[in-house]
Amino acid sequence: MLEEIGYKYRVVKVDLDKGDQFKSEFKKISPFSKIPVIIDHENKKSIFESGAILIYLAEKSGKFYNENNRTEINQWLMAQMGYVGPMLGQHHQFHHYNPGKSKFGEERYFKISKRIYQELDEVLSKSKFLSGNDYTIADIGTF
């Protein structure tokens, strides 16, 4: 998103293997000890959670979050945050990180992932982007 809106930024590595995300300094900006998180030094704010970051940057920049279509954009962004992302994440967990550990998990999340991709293909066969003809934060978050 930062690339899309043309904002300058600096990446700060958080070493998850060493547990950097659990240090008190990091928990001040990300209370659940998760990435991503951004710090807007201009406005002296930290923002955590992918969807919240996308909304914040879209509102700040005035890009990819059309006021006339926000309900539709929000629907698709929330679908990504609450369904698409978590389900594809589970598929990845069972098929790539822990193959052979749970036949039930592998089959379940393979079927769900396949259905998600079919549903997204169906939506995108009818419109250029998820929420219509404009590229939005819903598309950025989902793809």
Describe each region flagged by the PLM.
Residues M1-K114, D121, K128:
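GST-like domain detector, emphasizing the conserved glutathione-binding G-site
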